[in-house]
């Protein structure tokens, strides 16, 4: 089970990289999708969690972006998200937030 989860965590970003972008906007969503692939390990595919972890797909982009910034700064309490958020820039937060907000 752990190996299949690890495989999915690496396979999805690689597949997303292989997708051609139809326009600049689509390219940004693809990059946002690639960046948000690590979210799927806890939040489920496309941000739809099957368990107790919050669903993040379809949330307002500004809400997601602010939450990520607050996790990174420590303003918002977390067990795991603070550590994950430290690895991303504000630009990457915006791409992730826009991608997840588009997953309605």
Task: Describe the residue ranges of each PLM region.
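C-terminal capping alpha-helices of c-type cytochrome domains
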Residues: 73-76, 86-104
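The canonical Cys-X-X-Cys-His
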Residues: 37-45, 96
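Bacterial N-terminal signal peptides that target proteins for export
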Residues: 2-11
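Gly/Gly-Pro-rich "capping" loops immediately C-terminal to redox-active cysteine motifs
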Residues: 46-76, 82, 86
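Soluble non-cytosolic domains of exported or imported proteins
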Residues: 30, 58, 87-91
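Detector for the c-type heme attachment site
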Residues: 42-49, 101
């Amino acid at each position: 089970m752990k190996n299949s989860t690890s495989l999915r965590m690496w396979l999805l970003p690689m597949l997303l990289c292989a997708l051609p972008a139809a326009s600049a906007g689509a390219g940004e969503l693809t990059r946002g999708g690639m960046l948000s692939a690590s979210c799927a390990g806890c939040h489920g595919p496309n941000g739809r969690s099957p368990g107790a972890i919050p669903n993040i797909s379809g949330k307002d982009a500004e809400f997601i972006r602010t939450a990520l910034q607050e996790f990174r700064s420590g303003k918002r309490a977390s067990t795991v998200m603070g550590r994950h958020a430290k690895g991303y820039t504000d630009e990457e937060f915006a791409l992730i937030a826009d991608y997840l907000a588009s997953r309605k």
